[in-house]
Curated annotation (Swiss-Prot):
Keywords: Chloroplast, Hydrolase, Lipid degradation, Lipid metabolism, Plastid, Transit peptide. Disruption phenotype: Defective in anther dehiscence and pollen maturation. Delayed flower buds opening. A motif (GXSXG) lies at residues 293-297. This is Phospholipase A(1) DAD1, chloroplastic. GO terms for biological process: lipid catabolic process. The gene is DAD1. Sn-1-specific phospholipase that releases free fatty acids from phospholipids. Low activity on galactolipids and triacylglycerols. Catalyzes the initial step of jasmonic acid biosynthesis. Not essential for jasmonate biosynthesis after wounding or upon pathogen infection. SUPFAM superfamilies: alpha/beta-Hydrolases. GO terms for cellular component: chloroplast.
Length: 447
């Protein structure tokens, strides 16, 4: 590791007629391609002297700037140089207490974990063949053994165990046979399952982690599935009378459910088979399942989390970390997720319109008790409105960011606000609601 320090020697002359002034010394350091700056306030000498004040030894500066359990040059929001071990509180960081006290200000450990899982989604995008003129369009560009390494995660400590495909359930008209083949691609590679194998990483995390990563919308039929925005009942789901007194029952967006359940060997089947195999192999040790995705992948991640907790009665802790996801289901579906213990952390950009669709939401979750904005209506009308196939509910805990807070985003447009790299940039820069963007953010957007 290369470390350089360049202290600025303070002046040693003191004017007797003026009150004592503290001397401020600026120390800049560079560690692992990360720049940081510390400010040390030193008491001024009581009398004028030809010798400069005694500065702390360089190793003292290094101890202030470096910490083996923190990103170099970064301090906790409380100002403490003593890091919090991730492994000791891993369930808390996975949402056991719904991330209470970790989001505002954003805990440094949680920030790093969000960014780390975001990189798994980035790798899913990198591995997908987007070229419609390619004979391998819609497939994974890399073999399973080298996918993580070739898609930007060479030292993740994870091993890819399963490739995942999603199939559209849309019935194509006959005339589609004359259209380009890419328009009729019904089944395409959408992500993967990977398991942590590195002993040091397992020790750092405090458990063995299974990650399921989903990319966002890519194919023509996936876009069409996104437009099927009406709510539909979950297959084999509980009745609404058992959940919140509603007759509608848990419902989710039709297109998302179609992509998850369609096909002779559906995405749902693949996820279930692989999770069953991994539970058989690692079920006797601390284990977590973290499902992450962007855009369409965020919605699919939520459905997969629900399905895993429903299918496996002794399922490990299941957490969703989603980026820029659309709405997925109704209030009854949200209640079902909460009841089964599924934890969902939604990273939302206030300027991203995708997070505001589909349908409408008739509630405000800023308070502990859900408050219906339509409370002026008679209760029976409210119930009827909620049971319509267009009324959705926000699911999980929300980390709300804004493109307008970043000094690196000169303009606000729909495409930029929804991009995954914008989300990761905003997560890296966010401090708190009172300090929305830090100057030391590492992820600067390059355009």
């Amino acid at each position: 590791m290369r470390f350089s320090l360049s202290p600025v020697r303070p002046h040693s002359v003191v004017v007797p007629s003026l009150p004592k002034q503290d001397v401020v010394s600026y120390i800049s350091g560079t560690t692992s391609n990360r720049q940081c700056r510390c400010v040390l306030t030193l008491p001024s000498p009581s009398v004028s002297t030809s010798r400069p004040p005694v500065l702390p030894k360089p190793e003292t500066w290094e101890s202030l700037l470096l910490n083996h359990d923190q990103i170099p040059g970064e301090f906790s929001p409380t100002g403490s140089s003593i890091p919090v071990k991730l492994g000791r509180r891993w369930m808390e960081y996975q949402g056991l207490q719904n991330w209470d006290g970790l989001l505002d200000p954003l805990d440094d450990n949680l920030r790093r974990e969000i960014l780390r899982y975001g990189q798994f989604v980035e790798s899913a995008y990198q591995a997908f063949d987007f070229d419609p003129s390619s004979p391998t369009y819609g497939t994974c560009r890399f073999p399973r053994s080298t996918l993580l390494e070739r898609s930007g995660l060479p030292n993740s400590g994870y091993r890819l165990t399963k490739n995942l495909r999603a199939t559209s359930g849309i019935n194509l008209p006959r005339w589609i046979e004359k259209a380009p083949s890419w328009m009729a691609t019904q089944s395409s590679w959408i992500g993967y399952v990977a398991v942590c194998q590195d002993k040091e990483e397992i020790s750092r995390l405090g458990r063995r982690d299974v990650v399921i990563s989903f990319r966002g919308t890519a194919t023509c039929l996936e876009w069409l599935e996104n437009l099927r925005a009406t709510l539909t009942h979950l297959p084999n789901g509980p009745t609404g009378a058992n959940l919140n007194g509603s007759n509608s029952g848990p419902m989710v967006e039709s297109g998302f459910l179609s992509l998850y359940t369609s096909g002779v060997h559906s995405l749902r089947d693949m996820v279930r088979e692989e999770i069953a195999r991994l539970l058989q192999s690692y079920g006797d040790e601390p284990l977590s399942v973290t499902i992450t995705g962007h855009s369409l992948g965020a919605a699919i991640a939520t459905l997969a989390a629900y399905d895993i907790k429903t299918t496996f009665k002794r399922a490990p802790m299941v957490t969703v970390i989603s980026f820029g996801g659309p709405r997925v289901g109704n209030r009854c579906f949200r209640k079902l997720l909460e009841k089964q213990g599924t934890k969902v952390l939604r990273i939302v950009n206030s300027d991203d319109v995708i997070t505001k669709v589909p349908g409408v939401v008739l509630e405000n979750r800023e308070q502990d008790n859900v408050k219906m904005t339509a409370s002026i209506m008679p209760s029976w009308i409210q119930r009827r409105v909620e049971e319509t196939p267009w009324v959705y509910a926000e699911i999980g805990k929300e980390l709300r960011l804004s493109s307008r807070d970043s000094p690196h985003l000169s303009s606000i447009n729909v495409a930029t606000c929804h991009e995954l790299k914008t989300y990761l940039h905003l997560v890296d820069g966010f401090v708190s609601s009172t300090c929305p963007f830090r100057e030391t953010a590492r992820r600067v957007l390059h355009r």
